[in-house]
Amino acid sequence: MGNRKLPFGYQMRMGEIVRNEPEANTVQDIFLQYTLGASLKEIAEQMSKTGPSYDEGKSWNKNMVARILENAKYIGADSYPRLVDINLFEAAAEKRQTKQ
């Protein structure tokens, strides 16, 4: 396992969890791409080519994308700053349920 302690999209600054803007933008893009019909694999491939690194020395894969789509911290759970609109999060969750 790499060095990532916080979910992708966040960083610690002066003892506080804050947005990591480049990663936060990527998180929003992942949710948008997924709700518009892209597969987990397609998103992972795109992120490997153009997105910031998920974890040092690791390429993106569909499991990393799935973990992002399932993580309620992105809508502000557990006192994390919200990165994704709740409607977008719920649309992605609904799509994931219909695929199972």
Model regions: which residues?
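Conserved catalytic breakage-reunion loop centered on the nucleophilic residue
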Residues: 1-100
